[in-house]
Amino acid sequence: MTHSCRLSVAPMLDWTDRHCRYFHRLLSAQTLLYTEMVTTGAIIHGRGDFLAYNQEEHPVALQFGGSNPKDLAHCAKLAQERGYDEINLNVGCPSDRVQNGRFGACLMGEPDLVAECVAAMRAVVDIPVTVKTRIGIDDQDSYEFLTQFIATVAEKGGCEQFTIHARKAWLSGLSPKENREIPPLDYPRAYQIKRDFPHLTIAVNGGVKSLEEAKLHLQHLDGVMIGREAYQNPYLLAEVDQQIFGLETPVKKRSQVIHEMMPYIERELSQGTHLGHMTRHMLGLFQNMPGARQWRRHISENAHKPGAGLEVVEQALAKIPYQELGV
C-alpha cells in the first residue's frame, strides 16, 4: 500500500465532495481522504461523471455502495483507470434508501456476499480494496458475530484492511443521524479485533474529536478515521502531518489556507461552479475563535447570491480580528 490509513477523513454523504477534499488537502498533505459513497448504479447508469476528482486530492479513496460482484468489479476497474488510490466498500450505512438497494450495513448479515464482492474487485485491480463496517446490526451485536464477519471477508474475500465504526447500526427505527449518535461507542471491541487478527490493518471510526484522542486509539490500532469533527472543525487537520505522521513541515495558518484556496475557487467559478458549493466546506475554519460567527454569517448570507465571487470570501476574512489571522 502506497498510502497510510493512520489518519483519514470519513466518507460523508453530501459533505466530502471534491471541493471539500481539495480544501482538506490544503490543511494536510498526508491525511487519507474519502469520496462520498457512490453507488455502482450511479456509475453504470447515471448521467454525469461520478468519478471526477482533483489530482491534488491524492491520496484519495473511492467508496462504493453496491452488492453485485460483477458491477463492483466493473466500477473498480474504472476507478483504478481514473487513478484512485483505494476502493472502499460501504458495509456501514444504515439508511432505508441504502438497504433498499441491498448495500450498506445490512450486508453485515451476508458476509459471504461481501467476501464475493471484495474478491471480484481484487481480481481486476492492483489498488487496495478495503471495507468499512459497523460492530454489529440490530440484535446481531455479539463479538462472535463481528469476528465471523471479519474472518469471512478476510479469508474468502482477501480483504486486508477494515475500518470499524465502533457502534452497531439499527436497520430500522433510527435515522442515519441517530445511528451516528445513539448506539453506544465500543472502542475496545475494535481493539480486540486487532489483537485477534494481528495480520489485518484495522482502523476505527466514530466519535473521535481530537488528535489527542486519535493518538490514544493509535496505541491499539493501525488507523483512525475522523468524521463530523473534521468537517465542522477542519483546522483540526492542520497539525495531522506533524502530530500523527511525524513530519516537520510548518503548520499552516488559517489565513494561508484561505489564500491557497482562492485560485481553486476562481478556477471553479470560471467553469460555472457556484461559490456556495465550495465555501460551505470552509464555514468551520475559525471555529471557537473571535470573529467565527461573523465569518460564517457573511459567507452563508452572500455566497449563494447570483454572481458571488472571491470578494465574498475576502469580505468574510475581514470580519476576523487582525491578531487572530496570525494563528
From Swiss-Prot:
Cofactor(s) needed for function: FMN
Record's keyword terms, sorted: Flavoprotein, FMN, NADP, Oxidoreductase, RNA-binding, tRNA processing, tRNA-binding
E.C. number: 1.3.1.-, 1.3.1.91
Keyword presence, Transmembrane: no
Residues of the site described as Interacts with tRNA: 90, 177, 180, 293, 296
Keyword Oxidoreductase among record annotations: yes
Enzyme class: oxidoreductase
Protein residues bound to FMN: 11-13, 63, 132, 165, 205-207, 227-228
Source organism superkingdom: Bacteria
InterPro entries: Aldolase_TIM (IPR013785), DUS-like_FMN-bd (IPR035587), DUS_fam (IPR001269), DusA (IPR004653), tRNA_hU_synthase_CS (IPR018517)
Catalytic activity: 5,6-dihydrouridine(20) in tRNA + NADP(+) = uridine(20) in tRNA + NADPH + H(+); 5,6-dihydrouridine(20) in tRNA + NAD(+) = uridine(20) in tRNA + NADH + H(+); 5,6-dihydrouridine(20a) in tRNA + NADP(+) = uridine(20a) in tRNA + NADPH + H(+); 5,6-dihydrouridine(20a) in tRNA + NAD(+) = uridine(20a) in tRNA + NADH + H(+)
One Gene Ontology molecular-function label: tRNA-dihydrouridine20 synthase activity
Positions annotated as active site in the UniProt record: 93 (proton donor)
HAMAP family per record: DusA_subfam
Physiological role: Catalyzes the synthesis of 5,6-dihydrouridine (D), a modified base found in the D-loop of most tRNAs, via the reduction of the C5-C6 double bond in target uridines. Specifically modifies U20 and U20a in tRNAs.
Family from the record: Belongs to the Dus family. DusA subfamily.
NCBIfam families, A to Z: PRK11815.1, yjbN
Name of the protein described by the UniProt record: tRNA-dihydrouridine(20/20a) synthase
Source organism: Vibrio cholerae serotype O1 (strain ATCC 39315 / El Tor Inaba N16961)
Gene coding for it: dusA
